[in-house]
Amino acid sequence: MRNEMHLQFSARSENESFARVTVAAFVAQLDPTIDELTEIKTVVSEAVTNAIIHGYNNDPNGIVFISVVIEDGIVHLTVRDEGVGIANIDEARQPLFTTKPELERSGMGFTIMENFMDEVVVESEVNKGTTVYLKKHIAKSKALCN
């Protein structure tokens, strides 16, 4: 059975935790493990932070859009901005790459997303924005503790 939710909010860093908790609450209906839920929350944090810091250059007038679709035990997560876009997606996905070294960011956002999700697709157009599509299968059977 399909279920979906859509969320949009101002590109303010204090909204990152709101997005993370909201997505986690929605995904909880699948009864994910703590690890699965932590991975999803981390990925939401990374994608939203990228949109705020890189997409909108910390301009709080920007809007971050999140969509989550749950279908057949699969979480389809989309995080989109209408910011500056990414000129070279392949370069941006390299570990430790950052366009803002002065902020002492690690440049590991996309690497973390790729490690925690089953699929990551990034589409971007300069001066139009970036969309990150993420997919994760949630295990159906959970190990029982004795």
Swiss-Prot record:
Keyword Ion transport: no
Catalytic activity, as annotated: L-seryl-[protein] + ATP = O-phospho-L-seryl-[protein] + ADP + H(+); L-threonyl-[protein] + ATP = O-phospho-L-threonyl-[protein] + ADP + H(+)
GO molecular function: ATP binding; protein serine kinase activity; protein serine/threonine kinase activity; sigma factor antagonist activity
InterPro entries membership: Anti-sigma-factor_SerPK, Anti-sigma_F, HATPase_C_sf
UniProt keyword Cell membrane, yes or no: no
SMART domains assigned to the protein according to its UniProt record, in alphabetical order: HATPase_c
GO biological process: asexual sporulation; negative regulation of sporulation resulting in formation of a cellular spore; sporulation resulting in formation of a cellular spore
EC number: 2.7.11.1
Source taxon at top rank: Bacteria
One Pfam entry name: HATPase_c_2
UniProt cross-references to SUPFAM superfamilies, sorted A to Z: ATPase domain of HSP90 chaperone/DNA topoisomerase II/histidine kinase (SSF55874)
Catalytic class of the enzyme: transferase
Keywords: ATP-binding, Kinase, Nucleotide-binding, Serine/threonine-protein kinase, Sporulation, Transferase
Function: Binds to sigma F and blocks its ability to form an RNA polymerase holoenzyme (E-sigma F). Phosphorylates SpoIIAA on a serine residue. This phosphorylation may enable SpoIIAA to act as an anti-anti-sigma factor that counteracts SpoIIAB and thus releases sigma F from inhibition.
Family, similarity comment: Belongs to the anti-sigma-factor family.
Protein name: Anti-sigma F factor
Gene responsible for this protein: spoIIAB
